[in-house]
Amino acid sequence: MGNKINASQFYFEYKGHAILDISAFHSITISQRPTKPIVYLAGDSSLDNKFWLPSSSPGGERLTVAVPEIYKAALKPPRPKPDVAFWLNHYLGSRATALNLAVEASLLRERNSDLLAHDEFIRDHIRAEDLLVVSVGANDIAMRPNLSTICHMLLLAWLTSTSRIQSGAALPLRYFVNMFKTQVEKYVAKLVEKHKPRAVVVCMIYFPLEAQAAKQDSWADASLGALGYNRWPHRLQAAITKMYELATQKVQIPGLSVIPVALFETLDGKRGGDYVQRVEPSVEGGRKMASQLVAVINPLLGTVE
């Protein structure tokens, strides 16, 4: 086996993991588990939440569960951060390995012309026995919206009744159906253009933490305020729910099984302990998300032991 990856270096990267480290982790995984599936994570910080979490190294916070075996093989020292990938590996055990290729602070529209390097890694390495989990698009609204997105979100948040959102009659919803269905389909199609995996799990984002639920400062406070979330959280929540129904549940990739997952069923905006900065999954939030995802992944693994 090749050299192990320096754990501090592996988690130091803000935007995803360094490609060299990912390549090393992938090689170690293949050497350790050549016949087992890899679960690739693609998208944004809803899956790449490591930056917001405490270290498990001395001076940090102790893990509440044993370190999954794959980290003992890949990291030196074997002290992973308890991010979404960690919890997936905890639940999956030796049956499959989760590998995080999602990128913090990345956008869906960034991928319109060219894939990110992390996406290209997935495209070039994913196999027929593997699975792909995608969660992307939230930063196009909350972090760096373009002018068109801002206009449609303001129309939806301030000039549209909740009842029209819930009925699907709100005209601004069409814009976001294009984003979360058509644009996500194009993105996923690029990821699987060389090899089609066993299945793709496409996620709709969770609800942000409600202002009334717990006091947390957030980089997204201004955006959440502009969207009316601090005053009427139910309105944005209704929009996310409807976008799941009209967009995520309708995603289709020719020749591929697509399973929609509503992360807001797990992170519902009511519990401060599930969040960091109101919009990032905490250790506990990531654990809950991983548990939800594994419930979908387990049947797809079939007889893998």
Give, region by region, the residue ranges found by the protein language model.
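Serine-esterase "nucleophile elbow" of acetyl-processing enzymes
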Residues: 2-102, 123-125, 151-155
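A structural motif corresponding to the C-terminal end of an alpha-helix
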Residues: 84-97, 182-200, 239-262
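Oxyanion-hole/transition-state-stabilizing segment in secreted/luminal serine hydrolases
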Residues: 112-175, 207-216
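Short, well-ordered beta-to-alpha junction loops that form the rim of enzyme active sites
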Residues: 203-207, 262-265
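Substrate-gating cap/lid alpha-helix
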Residues: 210-261, 286
